[in-house]
Each structure stands twice: as structure tokens, then as C-alpha cells.
């Protein structure tokens, strides 16, 4: 009997202390997503008439109080205590990470519940972006946001690669038609993208085609501008050449006009004998001053010859006279005195 009583007493003591510790304190870890709302639910707790006051605190700072069915204290609008005692935190940010504690009291002010929560926040993953190249037979899966996530790549429903990094690069064996799915997930979120790739062996990559088209357009614009520039330069050069030819023509004409002597109309040449035609070859040259005798004509005496020559010589025109006066004065012929008639007859 004594041994049985001792065993029973030991069992009751162990159960009492263990149950008391479980009710009094629990450290619960909760993961939340940034920019989302979260509820801190009290496990195995149900509101009753005996519970009068519920207080929530973060660290040593009281943030909310619920008493007699209504909110009596609220640090800011981010925190709210629901009717079942749950704490709701709106639009989570990094400052909301930490340890939260809840205490429940009955009408006598006795603490009937005490729980502790540790809140950790994670960034939600973004939707994966899948890109590929038919030329290089490569496929890339990439995410831009997320913490503590895992990236997985599936080919025709079968997982072929996974990585904790933000990028997965997969080298395909051929350009056959294939279905790919990329999934990114962490504890608080999950996103996925799917694509069906159709590449032919002799096909061109869309980026290569776009590059060729863009290069052709740039080349066409360059050639058009070059042709326009060349035609414009040709027009300017032809116009300049025409102007130079016109200036040269005016210059030549003005020089030719300056070289020609100023002739006065009605003037006679200085040497009338030079303008006369040469005598026929049958005529022999005669001595100067000898004139052919006409039959039946009597030669005049020397005095009469001089007078006769002076009468036959035409009077110089004003233009010729002016032209002759420019040079040195010409010698004037001597006029022999007429011999008396008696002397001529006696001789």
C-alpha cells in the first residue's frame, strides 16, 4: 500500500506542474507576408463570461486592450482586437516583426491565460518570367522578388531543375515543341508561369529577325540622306560653275573691247597706195616720178606738175588730220618758183 500511494502522489505532482507550465507560457512562431494583413489567433481559447479583460503587448509596450466586449485601448489603427480575442495587424511592415504577448483576466483580475507569439515577415514571390532563344536553345526562368523561396522548372510535367536562386538557365537538347512550367514559392506565397515553345531547326529567332529589320531600316534612312546630300552638293556646284563661266565670259568680252582701236567713221587710210591692188605682171616697174605719156598729150613743165599734183591730192578729212597730228610733223614739199615765159621759150 505504501508503495502504491507514493507512486500516485508522484504522478499527480508531475501532471500538475507540467500542465501548469503548458497553460501559462507558450512560444508560437508565425510567418507573415509583407504588405498583407495577419491574424494572431489564440490556440485552444474560447471567450466566455468569466473572461473580462484581454490585453496585447509587443515587447514591453501595450498596443491594444479589449474589455467587456469592446475596444478600450488602441495604439494606432494598425492593431485591432476581435471579439474572440484575436489580434489583427493590417498592412504588415518590417517594423511589425517581433514578439507579441497576450494576457487574459477574469472578473476578479486573475490571469487565466498567457501566450507568446514570435512574428517573422517574408517578402512574397513575384510571378516568374520565362524567356528563351531558338538560336541558342536555352531557356531562362527568373523572379525579381521574394525571400526564402525555391524556384522549380518543369518540362512536360516533370521537374527537371530547382534552385534557391532567382534565376534558372536550362540548356535544351533540341528545338522540338515542349511545354515548360516555372514555379516560385515560399511559406507565405506561390506563383507560377507556363509556356509552350515551338522552334524549327531552320527557323530564325524573333530577336534576330527584329535586329535585321531594324538594321535595314537604319541603312535605308542613311542611304536616303546620303543621296539627298549628294544631289544638293551637285546642284550647288553646277550653280557655282555657271556663275564662274558667266563671270569669265564678261571678263573676256571687256578685255577684247579694251584692245580694239577707236576708229572714227569716214576716215581714210594713211597710205592710199597700200590699199590699191598691185599692178599686173605685164607692166614693168618704172622709175619714181615717171608717168606714162598719153599719145597726143604734151607733158607739163615741172612747175605745172607740182601744182597739178597738189590739185589732184584729196583734202584730208578731219579724222585723218586728227590722226596725223598725233605723230611728229611730216615734211612739206618744196614749191619751185615758176620760170618766166620768156626764159622758157628761149631755152
From Swiss-Prot:
It is found in: Cell membrane. Residues 25-205 are extracellular. It comes from the Eukaryota. Residues 58-70 are annotated as: CD58 binding region 1. This is T-cell surface antigen CD2. It comes from Equus caballus. Residues 252-347 are annotated as: Disordered. Residues 25-123 form the Ig-like V-type domain.
Amino acid at each position: 500500500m505504501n508503495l502504491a500511494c507514493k507512486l500516485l502522489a508522484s504522478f499527480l505532482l508531475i501532471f500538475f506542474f507540467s500542465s501548469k507550465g503548458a497553460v501559462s507560457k507558450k512560444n508560437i512562431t508565425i510567418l507573415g507576408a509583407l504588405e498583407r494583413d495577419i491574424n494572431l489567433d489564440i490556440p485552444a481559447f474560447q471567450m466566455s463570461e468569466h473572461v473580462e479583460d484581454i490585453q496585447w503587448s509587443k515587447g514591453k509596450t501595450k498596443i491594444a486592450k479589449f474589455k467587456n466586449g469592446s475596444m478600450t485601448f488602441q495604439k494606432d489603427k494598425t492593431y485591432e482586437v476581435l471579439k474572440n480575442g484575436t489580434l489583427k495587424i493590417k498592412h504588415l511592415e518590417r517594423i511589425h516583426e517581433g514578439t507579441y504577448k497576450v494576457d487574459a483576466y477574469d472578473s476578479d483580475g486573475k490571469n487565466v491565460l498567457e501566450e507568446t507569439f514570435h512574428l517573422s515577415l517574408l517578402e512574397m514571390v513575384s510571378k516568374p518570367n520565362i524567356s528563351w532563344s531558338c538560336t541558342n536553345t536555352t531557356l531562362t526562368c527568373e523572379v525579381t522578388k521574394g525571400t526564402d523561396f525555391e524556384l522549380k522548372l518543369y518540362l512536360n510535367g516533370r521537374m527537371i531543375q530547382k534552385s534557391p536562386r532567382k534565376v534558372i538557365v536550362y540548356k535544351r537538347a533540341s528545338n522540338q515543341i515542349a511545354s515548360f512550367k516555372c514555379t516560385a514559392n515560399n511559406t507565405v506565397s506561390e506563383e507560377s508561369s507556363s509556356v509552350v515553345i515551338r522552334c524549327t531547326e531552320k527557323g530564325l529567332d524573333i530577336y534576330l529577325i527584329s535586329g535585321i529589320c531594324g538594321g535595314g531600316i537604319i541603312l535605308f534612312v542613311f542611304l536616303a540622306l546620303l543621296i539627298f546630300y549628294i544631289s544638293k552638293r551637285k546642284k550647288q556646284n553646277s550653280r557655282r560653275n555657271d556663275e564662274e563661266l558667266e563671270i569669265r565670259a564678261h571678263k573676256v568680252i571687256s578685255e577684247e573691247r579694251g584692245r580694239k582701236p577707236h576708229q572714227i567713221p569716214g576716215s581714210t587710210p594713211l597710205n592710199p597706195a597700200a590699199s590699191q591692188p598691185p599692178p599686173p605682171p605685164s607692166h614693168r616697174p618704172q622709175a619714181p616720178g615717171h608717168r606714162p605719156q598719153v599719145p597726143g598729150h604734151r607733158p607739163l613743165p615741172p612747175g605745172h606738175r607740182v601744182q597739178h599734183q597738189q590739185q589732184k591730192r584729196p583734202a584730208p578729212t578731219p579724222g585723218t588730220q586728227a590722226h596725223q597730228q598725233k605723230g611728229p610733223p611730216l615734211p612739206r614739199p618744196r614749191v619751185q618758183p615758176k620760170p618766166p615765159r620768156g626764159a622758157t621759150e628761149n631755152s
